């Protein structure tokens, strides 16, 4: 099976076991939330910011890479967002460790659902229409949270199955 795009991204980010463990820290997951809004706001203000736009765009982009490495692993994986991260890891590794079809179908569907929301987001940025761009950003984030909730379900399902097998 061809490598999935999420696995390619994780590979480019050098997401090894230690990095995933650190990324499961709730501080890591929650401090990623403002990345997309920050990028959108900087792009909306590009005329006002001028050359500083490029510097301000680089900060959240650098944070995307640094973030999973910036915090220690959590003491437990009990937090909702920690389980979401570990479910996301299972999703990324689905070519090597198959996941139940129902989880795969829902995750793929939610990923596809984000695509139409990107159209008004990109248009809003291009047209400097802040209400449109920010509404679309909120929609993309809402769909991402739905996806993360499904990743929690995937992680909990896998954890229960593996616990039952012991």
Which role does the model predict for each range below?
Residues 31-40, 103-122:
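Core segments of transmembrane alpha-helices
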Residues 81-109:
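Short membrane-interface loop/juxtamembrane segments of multi-pass integral membrane proteins
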Residues 33, 43-75, 143-145:
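Hydrophobic alpha-helical membrane-embedded segments
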Residues 1-12, 77-92:
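Short, charged cytosolic
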Residues 41-55, 122-134:
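Helix-coil boundary and interhelical linker segments in multi-pass alpha-helical membrane proteins
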Residues 134-148:
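Alpha-helical membrane-embedded segments
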Residues 1-36, 147-166:
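Cytosolic-side membrane-entry/anchor segment at the start of a transmembrane helix
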Residues 70-84, 151-164:
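A cytosolic-side transmembrane-helix exit/cap motif
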């Amino acid at each position: 099976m061809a490598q999935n795009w999420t696995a390619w991204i994780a590979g480019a980010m050098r997401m090894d076991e230690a990095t995933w463990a650190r990324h499961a820290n709730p501080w890591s997951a929650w401090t990623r939330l403002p990345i997309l809004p920050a990028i959108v706001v900087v792009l909306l203000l590009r005329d006002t910011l001028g050359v500083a736009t490029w510097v301000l765009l680089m900060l959240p982009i650098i944070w995307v890479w640094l973030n999973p490495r910036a915090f220690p692993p959590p003491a437990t994986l009990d937090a909702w967002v920690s389980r979401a991260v570990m479910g996301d890891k299972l999703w990324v590794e689905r070519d090597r460790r198959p996941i139940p079809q129902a989880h795969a179908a829902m995750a793929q569907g939610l990923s596809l659902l984000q695509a139409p929301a990107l159209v008004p987001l990109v248009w809003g940025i291009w047209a400097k229409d802040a209400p449109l761009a920010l509404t679309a950003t909120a929609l993309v984030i809402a769909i991402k949270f739905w996806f993360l909730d499904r990743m929690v379900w995937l992680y909990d399902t896998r954890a229960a199955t593996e616990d039952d097998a012991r």
